Amino acid sequence: MTTTKEDADKVNETKVYTYDTLGRLIKTVTTDHRKDDKTKTVTYTYDNVGNRLKEDNGTTTTSYTYNGLDQLKTSTKEKGTAVEEVRQYDYDANGNQTDVKNTKTGENQTYVYDAENRLSQVSVTKDGKTAVIQQNIYNGEGQRIQKVDGDEMTNYYYQDGVVAYTTDANGEQNSQNLIGTDGNVLATERFQQNATQYYLYNKDIQGSTSSLVKEDGSADATYQYTDFGETTIQGDDQAKNEVSYTGGIYDQSTGLYYLNARYYNPEDGRFLTEDTYRGENNQPNTQHLYVYCANNPVNYVDPSGHGPVGIVIGGLIGYGAGKLILPKIANRLHLKGKKKVVYKIRYRCNNSVRRNGRKLFWRSYSIYLC
């Protein structure tokens, strides 16, 4: 499979993917047309049940070991014959990853879970000092409704399973998302110090954010990803955007992705916890409890955290039928008059939502482009 990506002078590359007979990604060759067609090759090897045994990017090689429950036990990164990093992993009786110890740096990252096996706290210990870097709270449906990163609190409010808007520790609304009918976040408003900034998401075919564009057409931030979603953000990122790889919520403080049912570690290509969905008997690749998208992250995404979903060709952002556009943002992005617009307005109320110190009712607007 071959894909080509081109974004002015920023990205101009071609990727060629190779798979084994089980459909698992085993090689990616990237040709950078900006640098005299220089190529970079990354290869992956797996065991019979789908555990990644080795990743080789031409510069470093990372090897992995597992226990009998397919739980990751060690990862060793080598450059030539020199060992650069060794990590050791531990799990609790429920199959939740609880500790990641870097034996070279002495840093230990600890995960704590609630009674429903949901990640509730992440802390880091180094040189005998422990710091809590993240705390999470969930509602009865299992959705994360609050995240505390250091001294910054974010409260999440959902529409049909997708984050519609957020508030800060004082209940002040600081964002409002524009959501498509397929649950795709198309644009967003950010409220900061009595000012409003509008942003439009540019996304690739996987639904991953490639750039966040301001009203003047300039990019607030650009995003690049490895095959399994390791994320590099360049730019100011004034919007503090979290919607990144395949539309998942990226927690920069932990390096993890919140994919609703579970948290995903793109560096290892695995989830931290077992999947409560045990897969289908006639589809063995769905029965692994930890691996991401059956080791085929190019053609599949996992928005629920429960299993791979095939990518629909042609599912890119555009003025197509059925997209949801908020009135204010639609006008700001000069969509008025582009298509016949039918307004379908719904109202609903949430508790203590405030903007600029004033309590207000949340109004959910849905505008369908026909």
Locate predicted features.
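Hydrophobic, gly/ala-rich membrane-insertion helices/peptides used by toxins and envelope proteins
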Residues: 306-370
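A short acidic/small-residue loop/turn micro-motif
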Residues: 9, 32-35, 60-61, 78-81, ...
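A motif-centric feature for acidic-aromatic and gly/ser/thr-rich catalytic loops and repeats
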Residues: 48, 54, 58, 62-64, ...
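A cytosolic small-molecule/anion-sensing beta-strand core signal
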Residues: 93, 115, 140, 205, ...
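Polybasic, low-complexity binding patches
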Residues: 277, 301-310
